[in-house]
UniProtKB/Swiss-Prot annotation:
UniProt GO molecular function: rRNA binding; structural constituent of ribosome; zinc ion binding
Cofactor note: Binds 1 zinc ion per subunit.
Binding-site residues, Zn(2+): C20, C23, C35, C38
Protein function: Binds to the 23S rRNA.
A GO CC term attached to the entry: ribosome
This protein's name: Large ribosomal subunit protein eL37
Domain of life assignment: Archaea
Keywords carried by this UniProt record: Metal-binding, Ribonucleoprotein, Ribosomal protein, RNA-binding, rRNA-binding, Zinc, Zinc-finger
Organism in which the protein naturally occurs: Methanococcus maripaludis (strain C6 / ATCC BAA-1332)
Entry similarity comment: Belongs to the eukaryotic ribosomal protein eL37 family.
Cysteines engaged in disulfide bonds, as pairs: none
BP GO annotations: translation
Amino acid sequence: MTKGTPSQGKHNKGSNHIVCRRCGRRAFHVRKKVCAACGFGKSSKIKRFAWQWKKVTGKGNRVK
């Protein structure tokens, strides 16, 4: 068995993220037990931020 750069390519076999039970996205980290998308396993509230949505300013810029 050789060591060094050639053997580092063998470290990408498994998958870190599986399907989340709460949001259904493939973002649940297996070792951390936390969903990167919705925050399941870390908090009971859905993970959301203000920068996810465009800000509404005035009458001409309505966002649905």
